[in-house]
Amino acid sequence: MIKALVGLGNPGPKYKDTKHNIGFKVIDEVAFKLHLKNPLEKYMSIVFHIKEQDIYLIKPQTFMNNSGIALRQFVEKTKIAPSDILVIYDDMDLPIGTIKMKPNGGSGGHNGVESIIRELRTQEFPRLRIGIGRPASKEEVTNYVLSPFEYKDTPIVKKTIEKASEYAIRSLEEPLEYVMTLCNTKSS
């Protein structure tokens, strides 16, 4: 079972509703569902800690491309293995509304995941990938991920965040392989 959920995103109101911050949105939804309040600021992150179960919800505050720095600090202090940390992030290779889990792997071109791989010196950490779709041209990637979802996509995005938060919570309570099978066989 997972011991920490890490949602990737960028800090500050400017980025709050961007596609790149969907990992933060999932963490916020998990915290809401678990009735968690008053997060701490530590490990260069916003952190919710469920002491009874020793579970963490983390939103690195280092900006996306340096997420690994915050996560390395967390791992060094808590001694939680990377394989027990579920990283939640946006994925342009998946259509909007799609959710997929995988046990490990490369960065897939995601700078936040690349930073984590570099800082933790391993690819052996599970991921919960949330589809945000792809822009029409490669030149638009930065603007695309740093812009909000289109209004027409709002209902599906809300439903996706809700569903992703359910998988994240289940990963804290049930074997990851089981949750992964559920996630990857559902039509998300």
Swiss-Prot record:
Coiled coil feature spans: none
GO cellular component entries: cytoplasm
This protein's UniProt keywords: Cytoplasm, Hydrolase, RNA-binding, tRNA-binding
List of catalytic residues: 20
Record's catalysed reaction(s): an N-acyl-L-alpha-aminoacyl-tRNA + H2O = an N-acyl-L-amino acid + a tRNA + H(+)
InterPro entries, per the entry: Pept_tRNA_hydro, Pept_tRNA_hydro_CS, Pept_tRNA_hydro_sf
Subcellular location: Cytoplasm
Transmembrane segments annotated in the record for this chain: none
Top EC class of this enzyme: hydrolase
Chief subcellular location: cytoplasm
Lipoprotein is among the record's keywords: no
Keyword tRNA-binding: yes
Residues the record lists as binding tRNA: 15, 63, 65, 111
Its job: Hydrolyzes ribosome-free peptidyl-tRNAs (with 1 or more amino acids incorporated), which drop off the ribosome during protein synthesis, or as a result of ribosome stalling.
Name of this protein: Peptidyl-tRNA hydrolase
Origin organism lineage: Bacteria, Pseudomonadati, Aquificota, Aquificia, Aquificales
Gene (name only): pth
